[in-house]
Amino acid sequence: MSTRMHFSQQTLSLLFDAILVDDIVDQHIELPAYLPTNFSSEQLAECLNLCQQLWLEGVANTQLRCLIKKIIIHKNLNSEERLSYKYIRAKYKHMGFAFILYTASHKRPLLFEATSTLMGEAQDAFRNQVTSKTLSTGLLLNAITAWPFSQFTQQYVQNAKLDPQSFMQHFKNDGKRIPEFLASHSVTPAQFHALRKIISRHVSFFDTLRTLYPNEMYYKMSRFLSAINGMMGSMHDELVQKSLLKKIDYHKDKISIPNE
């Protein structure tokens, strides 16, 4: 494992505070004059290191498994448990975006992806009181977060490595995909979610960057993208609810992308 910088608890807290508002729509949103694209290898390496440290020090597998067992038994979580679950999932999502952004494969490792995805599906299920789905996702989560799988997941995070050249190409390609989506007359909910994931990972990048390098332009990019992310998130929550209630086919039915 390569040597990494170690950041203070204050820096970790600043990043997590930014993550917690990455879907909040500010009253006054201003897009920067231009999209920043000139990032040094040192900046990118520090961003990845911070994401790794946030996950490694901020996600306790024992706590996650305790919550999973409650999901299995009660098919739900109380308000305090939901908040703990939300915080763990937020750190999983942020590290997941880091795998996609910074590493050469631009993919989450399969086991990490499965855990993060199932956490989201379980949350959607218990929020919407779909007990059968809550139980099935809970059982799967219980299996893949047990030892030795939990050890593999930790090693994936520890061993994630930056590819600076690949980052820039992927970052630019993401930027090209957004107008392609928006030019479509209609998309499936799954395609809409794919577009939101692009926005979300760019939010995560600028959240991390502005934590390490406080800068008005980075802050504006983070908050502008967060506003879009938040509006899309509210719409996606409704689509997920309709899908769970069998009112729409998540992968086949078409929806219109809002103009505003």
Where are each of the predicted segments found?
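Function-determining surface determinants
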Residues: M1-E260
